[in-house]
Design a protein with these regions (language model features):
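Residue-level recognition of beta-strand termini and adjacent short loop/turns
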Residues: 111, 137-139
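Bacterial N-terminal signal peptides
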Residues: 17-29
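Edge beta-strand at a domain terminus
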Residues: 147-169
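Soluble periplasmic/extracytoplasmic beta-strand elements of cell-envelope proteins
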Residues: 66-68, 142-144, 157
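Bacterial N-terminal signal peptides that target proteins for export
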Residues: 2-18
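Central antiparallel beta-sheet cores of small beta-barrel/beta-sandwich binding domains
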Residues: 39-40, 45-130
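Boundary at the C-terminal end of the N-terminal hydrophobic targeting segment
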Residues: 30-34
Length: 169
């Protein structure tokens, strides 16, 4: 019969503090990585470049955050003229070009990963919705548009572009 070694590699008095230090270190590192991500910059509506329809440039607007259409897959009508904000409920604004149109307004940072009290404008139907934006640990931007309360809404998920995108004109 072979003798067995019964001496633990790490004594019980050291084991728990060591585990706590390791967990704390990894948790802090993960949180720091999420906090280093910025909402500002370019976002596209789909991971697959062949399915992308638009890109939005998110930037600081004073003490708040806003975003404008930066690129459109189809920026022109069939007649070659630039697409306009033709569904806007305000007739005076219907001739604005979609390219460069501000569609995200008034977002205030609640913390490093959440922006609230904003609005998102949908030029496809001319409707404006209350909105929040959340930056996920995976690096996606989740925009929730809703009427009244957030429960009754829709969430869009945007990603950073993987290919170079040229600003529309």
């Amino acid at each position: 019969m072979r003798p067995t070694l019964s001496v633990p590699l790490i004594s019980k008095t050291i084991r728990l503090p060591l585990i706590l230090v390791l967990v704390s270190t990894f948790s802090t590192t993960a949180l720091a990585g999420a906090a280093e991500q910025k909402i500002q910059g370019l976002w596209v509506d789909n991971k697959d470049p062949s399915r992308q329809k638009f890109a939005v440039m998110v930037e600081d607007c004073g003490s708040k955050v806003c975003g404008s259409l930066y690129w459109l897959k189809k920026p022109l009508f069939a007649n070659g003229l630039p697409k306009r904000d033709k569904h806007n409920p305000n007739e005076a604004l219907r001739e604005r070009p979609l390219c460069g149109l501000q569609i995200l307004t008034g977002f205030q940072a609640a913390n490093d990963a959440l922006w609230q009290d904003g609005e998102i404008y949908n030029p496809d139907d001319g409707l404006t919705f209350s909105s929040t934006m959340k930056l996920s640990p995976e690096g996606t931007l989740k925009i929730r548009g809703y009427v009244g309360i957030s429960l009754f809404g829709k969430t869009l998920e945007w990603v950073r572009p993987t290919e170079e995108i040229t600003r529309c004109k």
